[in-house]
Amino acid sequence: MSFSGRKLFVSSMKRIIGLLLIVGMAGWNTQTIPENNMLMYSSTFRQIQEDIRDCVITPDSAARAWQENMRNIRATFHNGDTCRMGDSTYFVFPIKGYTPQKSIGGRGMGYRAEGFDLFDMDVRGSHPAHDLFVFDRNQDNVDDRTWKPIDVLAFTSGIVVAAEKDWKYDSDLRGGNWIWIYDPCLDGLFYYAHNNVVFVEPGQWVNAGDKISEMGRSGYNAFKKRSPTHLHLMFLKLNKDALPEPGDTYDWLMNSIVKQ
């Protein structure tokens, strides 16, 4: 089989798998799914993300698949209780040993949610996230002040939905080594990108302030010399239909506690 033939075959198979995924999920009943199916939800979540990335699923189909899967996750963990947002310990600044005043890029002005579409790879230009910078001028993933790796901490408590650990420097994937964590209280997902070493697994519960990774430069653009070492932090709030809407975490970050 020629290279072009193999490529067409792989693309066709991915489309078939994506369609089977959507059809299968359409028959799920969120009221009868036990908690021990979280790993299945995690696998489905990752597959949807990969299908979107590889453009083997339409944006509408991706949105429907995401919606059904997140409804299942929400039904498993979200109990509708009010978040203890007034508690100063709810948010822990994600970079150990750094303050939000010194770390948040552009004093929060780098956040741009307009035009964001998680399900369409052709939509570009938005940046519904904050980049958190560290002291690493020689770009070796080590703090210039301590000569040690920089710990990335869970901003809030939640369940790890998916994680990537195997990014390679010659990959064109932009997120690098990433982590998705669902916070049942906030009913939304946090995305931590460009990590070096990831220490958590899908299905694992983490508490605010737990170490989840070490700061890195993984990702197609983040790896380049022009990019300072940083953590890319995004929050997607689930609306009533379990679809993602970007949320600005700047105030939460500014009022979070700092771990030294």
Where are these regions (language model features)?
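Sec-dependent N-terminal signal peptides
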Residues: 16-25
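Polar/charged, compositionally biased leader and regulatory segments
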Residues: 28-151, 250-260
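A short, sequence-level motif marking secondary-structure junctions
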Residues: 195-199, 249-252
